[in-house]
Structures are given as structure tokens and as C-alpha cells.
Amino acid sequence: MDDIHNCYRRTCIIIILSKSIIISNSDVKALIKHAKSEEPKESCALLIGNETEYDWNVKEVFLTENMDSSKINFTISPEQELEVDTIAKKKNMEIVCIFHSHPNSEAKPSITDKKFMSVNPFPWIIYSCESDQMKCFIFKNNTLEQISIKDS
């Protein structure tokens, strides 16, 4: 019997699945509408919900103002971030994702995005107005990882 268990232990393969962002189709549509309404500037938003071992589950979207009013950068004010964080905590949730748009480029992190992703350890959803694509990324262990976006 021990030989069977030892053989099993040696041949057992562990599969580690990446986490996903779970977000409703209506929230995705709201983010896209916000991005298109802010063109040619980048739009931004904070998404609140809960993180589990397997995913980040988005429950609410808070559209925010881009303080930079820029085509290539965005900044969410500390006051807006604090307000959203306070609302999330009252609902036993947390900020689980940062959203912003790229009006004239791909749905992938820019050099500036990567710099800020390293200090904001959330998944980042990026929507490209140019290609109408939405992708999600997280920067962890000095590595950029793409995360799947799933409908709730």
C-alpha cells in the first residue's frame, strides 16, 4: 500500500489557476460608456467588491474624475479614493480593481501604468477606445500578469 501512495505522490501534478476578475456585463458597459464619454482624455474608475482565493468579485463601480485631464495619463484624487474606500468598508467590501481607458492606444499597460501598478497592488482593467478591447493586468513579484475578465 505504501508503494501505491509513494507512486501517487511522485506523479501528482498540481495545477495553479490564475485569479479572474468577475464583473457584470452592465458594469462593463458602464465603464465603456464612461471611457467613450471622456474621449479624448483617459477615463478612470474604482471598482469595489471582495477578493477571494480564486477571484476578485466586482460589486460596484465608481466612475471618477481624471484630475490630469490628459490623453495619456490619469490621476484619481486622494479625496475620491478615500470616499470610495470609506463606502466600501461600510459595505464590508474593499477596492478590488482600478480601471482606466487608453483613448488612442492598446489595452495594455504603458510604461507609466507599470510604474504605478507596482505601488497599487490591485488588478488594473484597461479599455482601448481605439480597438474596443478590455483587458486586465496585475503587477506582482516584478512580473506583469494578464488576468481573465469573466461575466458575473
Identify the residue ranges that each predicted region occupies.
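Short, well-ordered beta-to-alpha junction loops that form the rim of enzyme active sites
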Residues: 101
